[in-house]
């Protein structure tokens, strides 16, 4: 009975040309990548395998004979042979495999694979089977390709340093060797002077000769320090510099000398000034000098007390000033009499007297004794100021004594209105009473009490004239010289909307019809009387000037108005408001 569990598999015959070629992996056929992955099928196969006879067709085999495929996957290639059929139909034997592996001992000679080898390997090693190295690493380190660019730093210390020494390419000679510090101490003074005069021309180390530093630190401008008590120290410092060693590795000595040169020039007092403009020090140097510690003072010489910075004496013999007395006599100089200075000056005027006297009397003397005296004139003056501040503890040691003062300016509307009226009216009448009639208009003199005041009137010519002006009430509307004279503007209560005096509004109804007629008559009278007033006052230049200004001294002393003036003011004010409201 045939086995029904067996599965018949039909395999299509592949092309024999395609079997010799390796299927593409990763989409390319690169030999090196295939060799690394372990696929060696890219080697050429011998011609015997290609000339094999074609396999038999699958139809020659019976249907009962199933085809078996080996399930093992290996890179070993199998040869294809025709399947063998069994004559007996009743018996079913296991089919023999169609693929048999090729024996490596067969007659097919395959060439030996040689990957990346340009020549045959040589076996010179004592170990059997170990070929010689293909790449010599020693040659790779020393060989430079054409694209290689050497670096200066790498060339300064090449690996084959002995070659350069043998060739004698060293720049330093036997006569240009640097002396050690211990050797220079043993050498005599003559050799030291020789090295100071002539330095070696070869490349020196960071060590510098101490002579250059010491001479730069010591040799200062002799004109500025001539006659000073510290000038005699230069000879001793130069001798010490010559006796010292030639090369100072840390340059400590030069730093000490430079520090000494700086500190001996700085003043030690708090408020002292510099002696000359070229010796001025910054504020930072002054603060560093004030906080000088004993350790920093150890580098200064023992004769520091005689330096210009030392406050030797507060009292100067050339200035005869007694600080203990409150008042001191001064010479009867006509300059003080002219300026109004008293002959007895207190402590408050001490600074001004010192500034004026010592600048004139001691200016030449201070220049002469600036180089030789232990204290300068400017330092002496500052010390006097400090002593005065210490003796009088209540006084403040400051020049800026500003005290705020309150200036109360009286603000009055009457004064302001009077000034405005004086500027707006360029003409003033002198010697003419208010009772005079011009153009048929009469002004009563008893409407307001007359007050005469003396006023200065300034004209553009620069002259001052005395005028008698008759000032009336600031709130009165009076007709003078043929025109309406407004001595004041509208009151502040009306302009600002504040409640003021009671006004009868019924008068506005009756005055509406008369407003147009009165306005026309008013304009006509103003234009008619304007020419007469100009001809009448042509002789008075001070009064007719448009730029003249008058200030009344009695503007604040106004008296109260009577009931008739108030009634007229209310009626005229209502008419004035009605005229402007219609426009």
Curated annotation (Swiss-Prot):
Q: Where is this region: Disordered?
A: 1-31, 330-380, 457-486
- According to the UniProt entry, which residue ranges have a biased composition of type Basic and acidic residues? 332-342, 354-366, 461-479
Q: Name one GO biological process term.
A: fungal-type cell wall organization
Q: Which GO terms describe its molecular function?
A: protein kinase inhibitor activity
Q: Which keywords fit this entry according to its UniProt record?
A: Phosphoprotein, Protein kinase inhibitor
Q: Where is the composition biased (Polar residues)?
A: 1-24
Q: Which GO terms describe its cellular component?
A: cellular bud neck
The PTM Phosphoserine maps to: 393, 398, 516, 552
What's noted about post-translational modification? Phosphorylated by CDC28/CDK1.
Summary of the function given for this chain in its UniProt record:
Overexpression affects chitinase expression, cell separation and budding pattern, and increases trehalose accumulation and heat resistance by inhibiting protein kinase CBK1. Overexpression also suppresses temperature-induced hyperosmosensitivity and sensitivity to cell wall degrading enzymes. Overexpression of both LRE1 and PBN1 confers resistance to laminarinase.
Kindly provide the name given to this protein in its UniProt entry. Answer: Laminarase-resistance protein LRE1
The scientific name of the source species is Saccharomyces cerevisiae (strain ATCC 204508 / S288c)
């Amino acid at each position: 009975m045939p086995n029904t569990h067996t599965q018949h598999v039909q395999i299509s015959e592949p092309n024999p040309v395609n079997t010799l070629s390796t299927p593409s992996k990763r989409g390319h056929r690169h030999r090196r990548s295939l060799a690394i992955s372990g696929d060696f099928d890219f080697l050429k196969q011998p011609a015997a395998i290609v000339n094999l006879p074609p396999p038999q067709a699958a139809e020659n085999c019976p249907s009962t004979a199933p085809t078996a495929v080996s399930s093992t996957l290996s890179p070993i290639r199998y040869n294809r042979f025709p399947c063998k059929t069994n004559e007996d139909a009743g018996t079913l034997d296991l089919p023999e495999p169609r693929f048999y592996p090729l024996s490596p001992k067969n007659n097919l000679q395959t060439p030996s694979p040689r990957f990346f080898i340009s020549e045959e390997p040589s076996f010179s090693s004592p170990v059997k089977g170990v070929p010689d190295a293909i790449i010599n690493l020693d040659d790779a380190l020393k060989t430079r390709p054409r694209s290689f660019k050497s670096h200066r730093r790498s060339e300064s210390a090449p690996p084959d340093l002995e070659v350069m020494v043998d060739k004698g390419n060293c720049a330093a000679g036997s006569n240009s060797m640097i002396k050690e510090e211990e050797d220079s101490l043993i050498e005599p003074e003559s050799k030291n002077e020789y090295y100071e005069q002539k330095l070696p021309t070869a490349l020196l180390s960071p060590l510098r000769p101490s002579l250059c530093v010491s001479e730069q630190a010591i040799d200062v401008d002799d004109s500025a320090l001539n006659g000073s008590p510290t000038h005699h120290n230069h000879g001793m410092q130069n001798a010490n510099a010559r006796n010292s060693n030639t090369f100072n590795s840390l340059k400590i000595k030069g730093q000490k000398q430079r520090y000494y040169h700086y500190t001996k020039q700085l003043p030690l007092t708090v408020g002292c000034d510099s002696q000359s403009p070229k010796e001025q020090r910054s504020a930072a140097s002054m603060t560093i000098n004030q906080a000088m510690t004993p350790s920093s003072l150890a580098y200064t010489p023992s004769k520091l007390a005689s330096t210009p910075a030392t406050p030797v004496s507060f009292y100067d013999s050339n200035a005869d000033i007694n600080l203990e007395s409150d008042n001191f006599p001064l010479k009867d100089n006509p300059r003080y009499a002219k300026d109004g200075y008293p002959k007895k000056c207190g402590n408050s005027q001490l600074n001004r007297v010192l500034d004026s006297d010592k600048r004139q009397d001691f200016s030449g003397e201070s220049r002469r004794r600036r180089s030789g005296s232990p204290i300068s004139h400017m330092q002496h003056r500052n010390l006097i100021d400090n002593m005065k501040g210490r003796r009088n503890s209540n006084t403040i040691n400051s020049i800026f004594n500003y005290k705020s003062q309150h200036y109360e300016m009286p603000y009055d509307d009457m004064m302001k209105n009077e000034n405005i009226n004086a500027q707006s009216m360029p003409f003033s009448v002198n010697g003419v009473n208010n009772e005079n009639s011009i153009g048929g208009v009469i002004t009563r003199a008893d409407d307001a009490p007359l007050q005469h005041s003396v006023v200065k009137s300034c004209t553009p010519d620069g002259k001052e004239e005395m005028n008698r002006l008759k000032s009336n009430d600031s709130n009165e509307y009076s007709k003078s010289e043929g025109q309406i004279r407004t001595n004041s503007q509208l009151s502040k209560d009306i302009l600002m909307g504040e409640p003021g005096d009671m006004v009868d509004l019924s008068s506005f109804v009756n005055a509406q019809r008369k407003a147009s007629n009165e306005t026309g008559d008013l304009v006509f009278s103003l234009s008619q009387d304007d020419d007469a007033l100009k001809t009448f006052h042509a002789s008075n230049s001070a009064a007719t000037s448009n730029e003249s200004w008058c200030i009344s001294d009695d503007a604040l002393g106004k008296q109260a108005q009577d009931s008739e003036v108030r009634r007229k003011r209310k009626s005229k004010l209502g008419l004035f408001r009605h005229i402007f409201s219609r426009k």
